[in-house]
Amino acid sequence: MKLKYLSTILPAQDGEAKISNISCSPNGSRAAIACSDRSVALLDENGVQKDRFTCKPIDAKYGKKSFTVLCMTFSPDSSRIAIGQSDNVLFIYKVGTSWNEKKVIVNKFVQPSAVTCLSWPFDDKILVGQLDGKVRIGLIKTNKCSSLYKTDETVVSIQTHPKRTSFVSAHQDGSIILYNFSSRTQSKICTLQVPPYNLVFTNHGLVVATSDRRVLSYTENGVVQQQFDYNDQSEKEFSSISCDPTAQNVVVASYDRLRLFSWSARRGAWDEGAPLEIQNAYTIGALGWKMDGSTIYAGTVCGGVFSVDCCLRRGMLKSRFETTYVAPSHVILRDVTNDTRTNVISNKGLAIDELKIMGKDRYVIGYTSSSIIIADTESQRFSELEWQSGGHEKFYFDFNNCCLIINAGEVTVVEYGVDGSLGWVRTELTSPHLLSVQVSGPDVEEHKKVKKLAYLVDPTTISIINLINGQQESFINHTGAVDWIELNERASKLLYRDKRSKVTLVDISSDQRSVLLSFCTYVQWVPMSDVIVAQSGDNLSIWYNPDLPEQVTNMKIKGEVEAVLRDADRTEVIVQEPTAKVAYELDNTQIEFGAALEKRDFDRAVAFLESNTSGTDAYSMWIRVAEMALEHGNLFVAQRCYAAINDVAKVRKLHDILEIADEASISIGGDGTHFYKVRAMLAIMGRKFKEAERIFLEQNDTESAIGMYTSLHKWDEALELAKVLNYPEYEQLKTSYLRALSDTGQDSKAAELKVSDGDTLSAIQLYIKSNKPLSALSAANNDSVLSQDENILRQIADSLVKSQLYDKAGDVYEKLKDFDKAVEYFKKGDAYGKAIQLARFAFPEKVVTLEQEWGLHLEYIGQYDAAVNHFVEANDLKKAVEAAIRAKEWPKALSIVENIQDQKVRTGYYGEIADHYSNKGDFERAERLFVEAGLFNDAIMMYGKNNKWIDAFRLSEEFHGREATISSYLAKAEDLDEHGRFAEAEQLYITIGMPHKAIQMYDRVGRDDDVLRLVERYHGEHMHETRKRFATQYEERGDLKAAEEQFLKAGDFRSAVNMYKDSEMWSDAYRIAKTEGGENMEKQVLFMWAKSIGGDAAVKLLNKHGMLMEGIDFACETGAFDLAFDLARIGAKDRMGTVHVRLATQLEEEGRLEDASKHYVEGNKPELAVEMFIRDNDWADAERVAKDHCESLLPDVYTGQARRAIEEGDHLRAETFLLRANKPDIILRYFIENEMWPDALRIAQNYLPHQAALIQEEYEKSELRNGARGVDSFVAQAKEWEQQGDWRKAVSALLKINRDSTDNDALIKHSTEKAADLVMKFLMGDEEYIGAALGALDEANCNEKAAELLLLFGQSRQAINALCRAKQWAKAKQVAQEYLPEMVPEIEKIYKESLKSEGRLGELIDVDVITAIDMMIENDQWDKALDTAKSQNYRPLLDKYVAQYAAILVHRNDLSRVLAVLERYGASANPANFSIYKLLMEETLAKPRFDYTEIARVRNVHLDVYNALQKESSEHFEEFSRALWALHLIAMRTALEEIGDSVPEVQKLCLKQSLSLLRYTDILVADRIFYEAGAAAKDYGSEYESLGFLLLNHYLDLVDAIEEGNGELVDYSPFENSDIPTEVSLPTRQWLESAKHEEMKEWVLASSVDDAHAKELVYDKRGVFEASLKDKRGTAEPCLVTGYPVIESTVRIGSMVAEKDNLNKFLVVIKSNQTENLLNVQNFVAKWAGSPLAISL
């Protein structure tokens, strides 16, 4: 906090005029200054003096100057000021809350001594410190004072704790006493050395500023915390002290100075702030801190008052609210538009970290580290509650006096002005429309306050809780989801609307619900009333009295209701009509009537009713006022109300009551309404008889209580009360009661009284007389004597018959042993159960007839379900069935029908029952019944009517043939198609196997989603193509979003991007590129987007995505330099040079060198222009640019020109340019390297004289090393001698040029070959020169020239060897073929070795493919080697290497790779490979679960071998044929098992395949094959269960043999009439896991004790096992589908056969359950058989 001088309030005087006290009001609107002239100046909130009044002496006789003002303080409500004076009096002045109120003394407390200090902690209590040492308390209401405690030392200061829990008093002797309000005890906590005149009580203890220039801090227990000592500084004694409203800051005043101390929560101690120096202020004797904490008023000894601004910092919110932090925990918010101020204070002392303005700028939210503060700027109330904010809370300010905080499913209610939450609930439904809260304002009386919350527990349940006690008041369940709720102002009623727009009103106290409207678009309570306004269509409905929801007022409107507005004069509904807003005025008088009742203003309500007598609901309103008046004891108003509605009885009654009250008022005083008879009679009027009884009995007025009941004819209550009270005239009362009953004909009631008195016989007679025979019978049965009296019983029986109570009469006759009459009356009374029960022992022959009659009776009365059993008992099954059908007991009806012997009758009923099951949806049972009844067409029509076309097709095919069915159903499908019933048409098309027609249908009508669905299901390979086609169509139609979706689903995002690019919808193109195309595509589209818009927009776009630099680069790369310049100019001027250089580079590539040079220069890269011209040998331009822009490059230009001159051999020009470039060293080095010694010496002497001697020395060494002229001389000599024709000397000179004379290999080779040419031309007869030439040629490695010389010399072999050394293989071979043919193989061998050593495989393949392949294999390049072998089109060669590679892979255990190799290059029929094929098969079939893909691959390999062996007619053909059949059956079964057993045909096909596999157990895993076959047979059903038992039993034998390692333990005798092998190799371990093995073992053991399971195979008509191919006639061909023998219904498929039914089933399964594996099986079979599969008719 900082202190800053603000302004002068009161100017200082020339002499002493001490300001004795300054006090600020708690509401912050006023400040009072006690001046030296005994007047009090009043300041407003801005520090401007608004008023002044003069203080009074204790008595006017003492004069105005007889006292001084010693102390002063404001009351807690800021409306009064207490002033303590030296003349032993304390005055309290009422100053009011406005400036125009008169200042009057309202309290005067005369004290025994002067009042030295004051504190006013409570409205009705004030603390007074006196000169005599007493601390007293003044009671404002009684105007009396009493002493709290007394000391002997003057009280110099009193300070109250900020929380008003205690206070301290400081005394002249330095002692400080702490007084606790709750315990009413005081204790001395410390004693100072000097009087503690300047004392404040803060939240953190006491702060005392003493006259010895020290500031001390104490705890509440009197322990010193801190001490600030200013004795060593230029400080004078402290004269006053003040604490801010938050008790976090303290200001201490002295001479010309204010010192500030602030509490540090982090340190837990006081920190001293910067002091404020005020020149010429002198001693500051009074301080007052304004309650908003922003300003301190300081009064001086000279009468001056100035203000000091104290704040931490200032700020602005929303450019409207000025924030002033006067403390970390205190912020003043000022609205600059109207200058209103709001305090936001943390009462916990926590720093306010953040402020937010919400709720239409009315509410302020302050956040601290652990709490939240909510302030209402209009009511100036704020609340603080504990809160840990995550930043996700929401605030609802739509409710009066409170707000709601929504956070993480919790709703917290906060009442303004009350710290802490009012309550909270948990709910996920937190919309403001689903919450309603009513909290009464502070002006409402405490007992009338309402605090309730209504919320939704779930979408259909409303809960209402009382926030005062936290109890749930109501729990409302609704049938539908609720979308709006609201409580009325008194929270007595709730309105809610559900999502079906039905509005319901709930009375919370009675839980009574009333539906107001079934459809409502707007509903609302009228503000400040219980009137409801709702809109339904063009009707506006108003309920002025919600207690009578049926009374509604309607008016027509022409728009939608927007709001309901109310002021003092009128209430209007604002309706938005088509052209304008219209206000519809409501009946404000009726609204006022409700308000009057709410305020209990009965006179006003009666006046309203009297002036509105014509209302339709006047009667109910009079009743309402009357009842409320009675409830509140206003009898005259109640009488007036009843008179208005002509209720004469109540008017008279009230008249009587009023007379009694008037009489009572004379004796008991008051208005007499408290007299007990008045209260009792009012209770009787309200039908509260028990309360009236209580009132009478409380006064011992028994007669009146009993008389009340008898006058009301409540004799039972009168007798009961008389009996309880032992009323002496009880018997007489009872007699009077009986007489009254007899007079009024209430014999039955008299009989009850007789029964209670024990006179049963009289009671029976009375019951019979009153025609209540049942009561008479009950009374007789309860009397042991009368229950045996035959006469009495017959009288009762006759009375029962007369009353037509026949069943009861039958009971009586049965009791009298008169069974005929008993049965007769039982029948008459329809008590057939009792009749039959009686007839079973009395008349057994009548039982069946009675059952039949009972059934007919039940049928007559409609109890058909009960009649069924009785018809059955009567053996009338037809009637039983009909009754069961009429009772809709269909299972019972069906069971009865099945017991009817007549087939014709039974069939008729089947049809009717089937119709029921059809309608019910139990189609399977209905089908069975229809078929049973022979109603095949009805069954088919049933399925058709219910769109179950598959079942309809199945039945139609079964009963009408397949061809006719397909034809009719195709026509039906087309008809459905034509009539727009596409879903049914689709189902039919698919059922008959024509999904393409369904696709065409949907495509024709534009139902693209259905097209895609069917294509995906039946033609998945065309899915992407179809999506692209649709996308193109959508694009053409302009539906780009749909086109985008299809492009993306087709995986063609580029087309989607291009589509949006073509449409210039760049944002969409960019979105797709970003999400689908990756970073490069994203950038590319973004840059093209920028290119399309250009300018500032392009720069903004690229900057938005952080791609400006990349955009410039992209523009340059794509040649869009105009865009690049724009982007660089607008957004990146530093890149302009780069763009110029990039453009120059492109221009250079295009040959536009002049333009390029300009851009190089503009790009600040002239050196690149120079280099460009140098590369182009444009020396003039290079020199020009270098001179103009970069002279440092001129030497490079000249050097380049020199280099060009050297290349052209122009040494003089080169020398000139190098000298211009100032580089003589380069030309010197050039002359030396080229042994141009004279020129070198010249340059050195002229330009590099320091090197001249060195060059001269080198020149001499060179001459010495090369003889006269060195090698050049030999060349010159040879040329000269050659010209002269001296060939020998020429050759000799040339041969001298060798490695001894020079290192120039080219010169040596040239000279040697020249010498050889001369020898061949002129010296062939001279062997010496020939030899010398050959030696030189060999030394110079000129083998080809040597071969030429040797060939001329006749040395053919040596010539050929020379050509081989020269790698001239063709020439060598040509020479060999001509001169030495025997050397040709040797040459070829050498050639191959050369190719091999050099790795030249391409050439080696052409020469020796075997060697080349072997080289590849050595390098582990098997794929390349096999491809090379395959390219030779020689199968044995390929088979050889395939077998070799396969063997290696097998050794590596890489069987998957073996399969891949065999699939790629084919499997050969070489027996050497058979072990590999066998291993592949064993390993694949050894896995726990068969994998179709792996089995299919092994099967395909075996097919290749099979075909090869078949062509060769190999002896191994049969072996591979069996293996292939086994693999084929396993693969087909595996593919079918993927579908599951849901398709019946699949299970049968899999079973047959499993049984067929038994014949291959000698090459398969025997225990597995037997187990799978046995399990399949067992699961199929009873037909094959015995076979399953046999096979599984054999499987167990095999497992036992495996465990024992002895194959002889297995018994094969059950398989004699089959082709199942009897000798199989046992595996090393069992295949099945132990758990399943044990399960199957238990089943076999359990089945072995069942005689139904015989150990035998299933035989066919051949007399052999049905899966066996062999029989007595020979061997049958196996079926391609099942492996079963094909005996009849043969279908020929290429070279193989299939059984017709099985083939058709298999193909139907493929069509209806198409899978990739089934299609693969179909293709394999077609390939194997050599013909495609097709359904056979």
From Swiss-Prot:
Pfam families per UniProt: TPR_IF140-IFT172 (PF24762), TPR_IFT80_172 (PF23387), WD40 (PF00400)
Cellular-component GO terms for this entry: axoneme; ciliary basal body; ciliary transition zone; cilium; intraciliary transport particle B; non-motile cilium
UniProt keyword annotation of Ribonucleoprotein present: no
Ranges occupied by TPR repeats: 700-737, 803-836, 848-881, 907-940, 979-1012, 1037-1070, 1137-1170
Gene ablation phenotype (knockout): Worms display defects in ciliary structure resulting in defects in ability and osmotic avoidance behavior.
InterPro entries assigned to the protein according to its UniProt record, in alphabetical order: TPR-like_helical_dom_sf, TPR_IF140/IFT172/WDR19, TPR_IFT80_172_dom, WD40/YVTN_repeat-like_dom_sf, WD40_repeat_dom_sf, WD40_rpt
WD-type repeats, residues: 14-53, 63-103, 110-150, 151-189, 191-229, 233-273, 511-553
Major localization listed first in the record, in broad terms: other
Example GO BP: non-motile cilium assembly
Keyword Repeat found: yes
Localization: Cell projection, Cilium
Keywords annotated in UniProt: Cell projection, Cilium, Developmental protein, Repeat, TPR repeat, WD repeat
Membrane-spanning ranges: none
Tissue expression: Expressed in amphid and phasmid chemosensory neurons, where it appears to concentrate at the base of the transition zones, which correspond to the basal bodies of motile and sensory cilia. Moves in the retrograde direction along cilia and dendrites, suggesting that it is retrieved from the distal endings of the cilia by a retrograde transport pathway that moves it along cilia and then dendrites, back to the neuronal cell body.
Subunit: Component of the IFT complex B composed of at least che-2, che-13, dyf-1, dyf-3, dyf-6, dyf-11, dyf-13, ift-20, ift-74, ift-81, ifta-2, osm-1, osm-5 and osm-6.
Family per record: Belongs to the IFT172 family.
Main function: Component of the intraflagellar transport (IFT) complex B required for transport of proteins in the motile cilium. May be required for ciliary entrance and transport of specific ciliary cargo proteins such as che-3 which are related to motility. Required for the maintenance and formation of chemosensory cilia that detect chemosensory cues.
Record protein name field: Intraflagellar transport protein osm-1
Gene name as annotated: osm-1
